[in-house]
């Protein structure tokens, strides 16, 4: 069964009429930059696939959270930010920090090699998680 996706303009109009400002939700991903460089030299497509796997897994695992449900209801307004981690150690340290702070996330492990490649958070309001991500820059 397919769910009808309502145009974002209709939803925004309804919110404007009710005086409710829509909450902006962002899904953050942190992808290992070193995988694109020697000695790994993974192709761009392989890195994009890792980010896609992590994002999909995080959305699925946290599908019952109200933020995830709201994010998925507004397909035309989805926001993702892809940041870069220098290496595996940096990525795993971030995963540990997120775990300690109870920030819902998925650490994607490429199989069968068991290589940590990407972290995806479930959708969050930016202000709730920016303090944990501010040291990471946009992936280039």
Swiss-Prot record:
Entry's EC annotation: 3.1.1.29
Catalytic EC class: hydrolase
GO MF terms, alphabetically ordered: peptidyl-tRNA hydrolase activity
Domain of life: Eukaryota
Keyword Nucleus: no
UniProt keywords, alphabetically: Hydrolase
Catalytic reaction equation(s): an N-acyl-L-alpha-aminoacyl-tRNA + H2O = an N-acyl-L-amino acid + a tRNA + H(+)
InterPro entries (UniProt xref): Pep_tRNA_hydro_II_dom_sf (IPR023476), PTH2 (IPR002833), PTRHD1 (IPR042237)
Gene3D superfamilies attached to this UniProt entry: Bit1
Function according to Swiss-Prot or TrEMBL: As a putative peptidyl-tRNA hydrolase, it might be involved in releasing tRNAs from the ribosome during protein synthesis. Some evidence, however, suggests that it lacks peptidyl-tRNA hydrolase activity.
Similarity remark: Belongs to the PTH2 family. PTRHD1 subfamily.
Protein name from the UniProt record: Putative peptidyl-tRNA hydrolase PTRHD1
UniProt gene name: Ptrhd1
């Amino acid at each position: 069964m397919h769910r009808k996706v309502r145009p974002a303009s209709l939803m925004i109009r309804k919110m404007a009429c009710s005086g409710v400002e829509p909450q902006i939700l962002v899904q953050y991903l942190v992808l290992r930059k070193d995988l694109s460089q020697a000695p790994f030299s993974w192709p761009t497509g392989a890195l994009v696939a890792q980010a896609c796997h992590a994002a999909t897994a995080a959305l699925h695992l946290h599908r019952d959270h109200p933020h995830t449900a709201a994010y998925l209801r507004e397909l035309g307004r989805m926001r993702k930010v892809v940041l870069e981690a220098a290496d595996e150690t940096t990525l795993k340290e971030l995963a540990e920090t997120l775990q300690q702070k109870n920030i819902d996330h998925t650490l994607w492990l490429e199989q069968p090699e068991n290589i940590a490649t990407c972290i995806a958070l479930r959708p969050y309001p930016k202000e709730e998680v920016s303090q944990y991500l501010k040291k990471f820059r946009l992936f280039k």
